[in-house]
């Protein structure tokens, strides 16, 4: 990994419904180096770009009477959920759906694209990457995140094997490939390491501080090339939501020879530390550029952003200042 990468989180998901071709395309065309698709499997084993297994928050599935019989309640990763699930639909059924904005009140401009954009398969995204790379004149990246791996494997829908097949088809299996795979589930990454040489990133949530102990990081280094930190591990906050200064996580991970990605940067007040918020509603954009600056000062290797243009602009200004 060279330099601070800007990664469009679920595409430019601050501007278009997440995980759609429009969101990914906009991220790349806004200057992002890579995009991040979450990946799960359909009933017939096709890898598709969705964050949640349950579909009603981000698609129009509830408006499809022909699918009403598939609504059910089930436990997913320890949580009871009710609705329509990706793994209960085959690809043909999923293709009848259209994407919707996850937070329509907060992201009204994105919600204007509701019910227009189809669900994308991972294969289609990899093809789109090739097209956009040719257009941009540079190798654009993809940071695949595998979701709900154990749950899907228990249903006979493993993620690793079909992913490896896709990577081989697209010649994206070497350490130099513009593709990274991320996951919270270490077993998924270990399985991939036996098959491909691409960069692998172990994700760590803000409450998983034990994962940052030196012994644990040594084990991560046996299969991964990087760690993806929740941004509050890099820049902790107090009980009032104010930043308390840099935490030790970035230095600790990098001291083990591992790259550091940070997730997820969002420009709205709701997601910023108190001191970077501006007067107005939670959906109003605050001083997100200052959060980017603080993370770059820590020397992070990549940023996952819903509004990638913000990080692109900060990095461009920073690069220009150094060149003077």
Where are these regions (language model features)?
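Phosphate-group recognition and catalysis centered on beta-loop-alpha active-site segments
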Residues: 1-324
């Amino acid at each position: 990994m060279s330099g601070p990468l800007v990664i469009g989180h679920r595409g430019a998901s601050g501007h278009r419904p997440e995980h759609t071709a429009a969101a990914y395309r906009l991220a790349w065309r806004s200057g992002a180096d890579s995009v991040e698709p979450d990946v799960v499997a359909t009933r017939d084993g096709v890898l598709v770009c969705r964050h949640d297994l349950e579909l009603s928050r981000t698609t129009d599935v509830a408006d499809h009477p022909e699918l009403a019989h598939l609504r059910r309640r089930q436990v997913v990763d320890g949580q009871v959920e009710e609705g329509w699930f990706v793994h209960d639909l085959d690809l043909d059924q999923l293709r009848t759906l259209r994407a919707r904005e996850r937070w329509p009140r907060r992201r009204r401009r994105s919600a204007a694209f509701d019910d227009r954009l189809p669900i994308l398969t991972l294969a289609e995204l990899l093809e789109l990457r090739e097209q956009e790379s040719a257009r941009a004149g540079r190798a654009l990246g993809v940071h695949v995140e595998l979701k709900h791996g154990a749950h899907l494997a228990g249903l006979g829908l493993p993620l690793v094997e079909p992913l490896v097949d896709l990577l081989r088809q697209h010649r994206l299996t070497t350490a130099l490939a513009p593709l990274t795979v991320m996951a919270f589930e270490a077993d998924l990454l270990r399985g991939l390491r036996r098959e491909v040489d691409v960069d692998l990133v172990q994700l760590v949530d803000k409450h998983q501080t034990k994962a940052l102990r030196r012994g644990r990081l040594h084990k991560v280094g046996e299969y991964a090339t990087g760690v993806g930190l929740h941004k509050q591990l890099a820049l902790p906050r107090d009980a009032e939501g104010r930043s308390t200064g840099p935490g030790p996580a970035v230095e600790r991970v990098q001291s083990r020879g591992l790259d550091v990605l940070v997730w997820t940067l969002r420009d709205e007040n709701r997601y910023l530390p108190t001191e970077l918020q501006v007067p107005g509603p939670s959906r109003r954009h605050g001083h997100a550029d200052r959060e980017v600056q603080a993370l770059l000062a820590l020397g992070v290797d990549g940023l996952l952003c819903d509004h990638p243009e913000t990080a692109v602009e900060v990095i461009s200004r920073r690069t220009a200042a150094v060149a003077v």
